[in-house]
Amino acid sequence: MNADLTVVSPQIQAQILAEALPYIRKFHGKTIVVKYGGNAMTEERLKHSFARDVILLKLVGMNPVVVHGGGPQIDNALKKIGKQGTFIQGMRITDEETMEVVEWVLGGEVQQDIVMLINHYGGQAVGLTGKDGGLIRARKMNMPDRENPGKFLDIGFVGDIEAINPAVVKALQDDAFIPIISPIGFGDDGQAYNINADVVAGKIAEILRAEKLIMMTNIAGVQDKQGNLLTDLSAREIDEMFEDGTISGGMLPKISSALDAAKSGVNTVHIIDGRIEHSLLLEVLTEQAFGTMIRSH
C-alpha cells in the first residue's frame, strides 16, 4: 500500500478506501495493541510511516496502544561503555550497569523518539514506563535451567510481570491520547526490572481485552525448519515447534506471549513483517493475508 495517494489514480484511491471501510467499522472503538520493534524502529522511512499509521488508526476510531522494544539501541549504548549484550533463551542478562542503560535508552531515547514522531504528524502520544500510575508491577525472574531441571538461572534484573494496572492507559485512551509503553517494570521496593517487550505487549493486550495483538518483527512471520512461512499456527503446532527446536532464541518469548494472549481472550494475534512499509495498516485495514496468525486451539 502506498501512503502517498497523490501518485495513484482517483479510482485506486477510492478502491483503497472502500476496502478499508468494513475493517474501520469492525474495529471502531476497539483496542489494538502493537509490539513495535526491529527495523521498523531503526530505519527512518519505516519510523515515519509507522507514526502515520498509528495516527490513522486513532483517527478512524480505534484505540492503538504501542509497546516498544529497543534491543539494537541498547546494544549500541552498551558498546559505547565497553559492554556486550548477552542473552539466554531470548532474555538479556541484565546486571546493575546494564539496567541503568536499559532505563535511559528505553524510557528516554527510544520512547521519546516515538512520542515526538507521532506528535510531529499531528497525533497525541504520551510515553509511559511501568512506574507511571503503577502500570507494571514486577518481581525478579527465576529462569528455569533447561540443562538442570529443578534449578534456576540468575540473569540479573530481568523481571516477571506480577500485575498490570491498566487505569492510566484507559485514562489516556478516554482522553484521545496514544499510550507509548516502555517495557520496564518496578518492584514493591522501587527496583527497576527489564522485561521482554513481547511479554509486556501480550499481558497488556490481555488486561485491556484487546481486539488485536500485532507483533512487528524482522522476518515475514514464523517459519518452519526449511524457512517456509507458516501463515497459521495452533497451540498444538507451537508446542511441537518448541519441542523440536524450530522455535528458539528471541522467538521463544515472542511466540509464548502471543499464544498466552490468544488463550486469554485476545481475539486475533498476528506476527508480521515490520520491514514492509505500512505493514500495520495492511494487517488491520485490508483483506491481505499477512504474517502468521496464532490460534489458541
From Swiss-Prot:
SUPFAM superfamilies, per database record: Carbamate kinase-like
Presence of the UniProt keyword Protein transport in the record: no
Pfam families: AA_kinase (PF00696)
Entry binding sites for substrate: 70-71, 92, 194
Alphabetical keyword list: Amino-acid biosynthesis, Arginine biosynthesis, ATP-binding, Cytoplasm, Kinase, Nucleotide-binding, Transferase
EC number: 2.7.2.8
UniProt pathway: Amino-acid biosynthesis; L-arginine biosynthesis; N(2)-acetyl-L-ornithine from L-glutamate: step 2/4
Domain of life: Bacteria
Tagged with keyword Calcium: no
Gene Ontology biological process: arginine biosynthetic process via ornithine; L-arginine biosynthetic process
Subcellular location as annotated: Cytoplasm
MF annotations from Gene Ontology: acetylglutamate kinase activity; ATP binding
Site (Transition state stabilizer): residue numbering on this chain: 35, 254
Predominant subcellular localization, coarse grouping: cytoplasm
Gene Ontology CC annotations of this record: cytoplasm
Family indicated by similarity: Belongs to the acetylglutamate kinase family. ArgB subfamily.
HAMAP family: ArgB
Name of the protein in question: Acetylglutamate kinase
